Amino acid sequence: MDFEEFEEKDGVRFSWNCIPSTRIEASRTVVPISALYTPLKEKPNLPVLQYEPIACRPPCRAVLNSFCQVDLRARAWVCPFCLSRNQLPPQYRDITPENLPHELRPECTTVEYVLSRPAPNPIFLFVVDTCLDAENLTALKDHLVATLSLIPENALVGLITFGAMAQVHEIGYRECGKSFVFRGNRDYTAKQVQEQLGLNQPIGHRVPQQGGHPQAQGAAARFLLPLQNAEFALTNVLEGLQKDPWPVAADRRPIRCTGVALGIALGLLETSFPNCGARVMLFAGGAPTEGPGMIVGPELKEPIRSHHEIEKDTAKHSKAATKFYEGLAKRATTHGQAVDIFAGCYDQIGMHEMRSLPNSTGGALVLCDAFSTSIFKSSLTKMFARDANNFLQMGFNATFDVVPSKELKVSGLIGHAVSMNKKNPSVADTEIGIGQTSSWKMCSITPAHTYATFFEVAQQQGTPAGQIPPGYVQFLTHYHHSSTQQRLRVTTVAKALVPGGDPHIASSFDQEAAAVLMTRIAIFKSETEDGNDIMRWTDKMLIRLCQKFADYRKDDASSFRLAHNFSLYPQFMFHLRRSQFLQVFNNSPDETAFYRHCLNRENLNNSLIMIQPTLLSYSLEQEQPVPVLLDSVSIKPDHILLLDTFFHILIFHGETIANWRNQGYQEKEEYANFAELLQAPRMEVQDLLVDRFPLPRFIDTDAGGSQARFLLSKLNPSNTHQSDSGYGTPGSAVVLTDDVSLQTFMSHLQKLSVAASS
């Protein structure tokens, strides 16, 4: 089975599919033993079991799976993780080799259980900025009203608006519009929110009812109601929203208390619905300028912080704001509340400081120029996408456990989660990412959320080759399904352990998974380390990997060869070095936070597109589009290029193609093939947009156009103003840059890898 089949079957891709059997040998592989796992990956044939799982005795708690040894006569099973012998329950008495339950069938390495405990209905609390211009506010209101039709009728909904003040709208009050106003320059605790809203009476809806529905009665029912009871009132409030009345002078920014509004939203939820899956959805059209969490003062003469100021620690408000939002993130994760941030303006809204909110809770980040754009509208609509059974494709209040067999230990996780501080003997001393635990919490989880898990080989001493058992890993994901069921997704995988030096180790290397996993480590390091240090670390790891696994003679660069399953890895690292994930120049702190958030969320395929974008070429000589090198030599006057960077989709018309189009050849009947050529990349774009979240920015440009820079910045500059004609081909573009080319990069890599003193 190849790597893609493993991913299709279980949503798992390992960096190494054969693992060295000792810790010292495993450390020599350079790339850690690690895996990318998509817990809720959509599978059309996924067994959904309507009974409780059978778990091993404590402290193991691994779930019965197809790798267990089952003694049908004794009605017992042996756990492959701790080797304990367990009795099968009475309901398994009729099983035979021909009639096995799904969890014991070899092909069912991933199953999902529907648990008997009900889950509460989901909660959606909108937090809306009213300091917007009339056009932007109208577009936002209209689309929020349209979005109500996408939310399940039994979901609870609420609304908070903010400008200079924050207002909690009492949508349960029928007589007229009513709201509770909070000052925008003050930090409110959850207790103060509770008292001011009158929520300090005993509330009976903290525990789900029999059917799994939280009782929306008592004081909280004034603010959070089932959509079927509140849609009319909420629609009226949204349609009646007006621009914040606080006056704004020409030389000042609007007074915007974003931090206070978010704090009140979390306070309302944690006092009324603790540990119930909820989404706080923030729609912001500018920077917070008031109260806790402000990132810039109201005077326009004070510029918004840049990367340079943040690095030099001269950004006036950034550190305090970051600390404030980290405190909110901790509160949100404690009670299972996800925070989504939608930015609808050209300016920054403080995503850099707020990044801990979506990063810790699994919320979404969407960055667009205005709420009237298709990027915002399509992205918000896709958030509420339904599955084949018409349920929302999102889970709430999830926990994620990794159970390894005794041969492996868990080093950590990188993804949108927080530690549950569950320390046990399977936790490694080495920490990568969020470590020192084998259990994490995800307040929100979707079929797109992918997590990087890292492992350490436990054994210090080697074992004779024929006696090494395989290593097992079980991933357990408990979550609240949007149907108000609690579910458990179980994936169990086995990997061969082999002695150090075994050729199977090198042949089992998955260069695509390794590139994404190493990128996640680099991004995790970037939160605390200097950018140049991370670049040096990336280069050092690449050189060490090549020294270990390349075929070469010492001090002879011309003899350097990489096996086919290593050959693309240096190329991935070259494009990573040039990417917006590590190179923050020309990006705002908000943009950098957005890009890194998306990479830490997406699956392997989408992550690779972010690291090394794809480029397709269309021409009259080719019936089908052809993948071409991400290189300046691919730009030709009689070709159309389609670039997909995940964040941007760009159609680039060569000079000749653009001239023909401008002369209107596509409108003439005898040039129907040219009209089809112009249309072909647009049809491909439509296919790309179907599953993409958030919606990418679409760019249509020509050779010499100002927006062609988006393409040129991603291409390998093999033909520059400084290079001689040895590189490139006649008619290819010249890129004006001082960046080194892939050819130069590979030449230096080969020299350093074969050097005896390295």
Curated annotation (Swiss-Prot):
Record-linked CDD domains: Sec23_C
Residues bound to Zn(2+)? C56, C60, C79, C82
The protein's superkingdom reads Eukaryota
This protein's GO CC annotations: COPII vesicle coat; endoplasmic reticulum exit site; endoplasmic reticulum membrane; Golgi membrane
Membrane topology classification: Peripheral membrane protein
Q: Known Gene3D superfamilies for this protein?
A: beta-sandwich domain of Sec23/24 (2.60.40.1670), Sec23/Sec24 helical domain (1.20.120.730), Severin (3.40.20.10), von Willebrand factor, type A domain (3.40.50.410), Zn-finger domain of Sec23/24 (2.30.30.380)
Note the InterPro entries from the entry.
ADF-H/Gelsolin-like_dom_sf, Gelsolin-like_dom, Gelsolin-like_dom_sf, Sec23, Sec23/24_helical_dom, Sec23/24_helical_dom_sf, Sec23/24_trunk_dom, Sec23_24_beta_S
Pfam families, per database record: Gelsolin (PF00626), Sec23_BS (PF08033), Sec23_helical (PF04815), Sec23_trunk (PF04811), zf-Sec23_Sec24 (PF04810)
Q: Member of which family?
A: Belongs to the SEC23/SEC24 family. SEC23 subfamily.
Report what the protein is called.
Protein transport protein SEC23
User: Which gene does this sequence derive from?
Assistant: SEC23
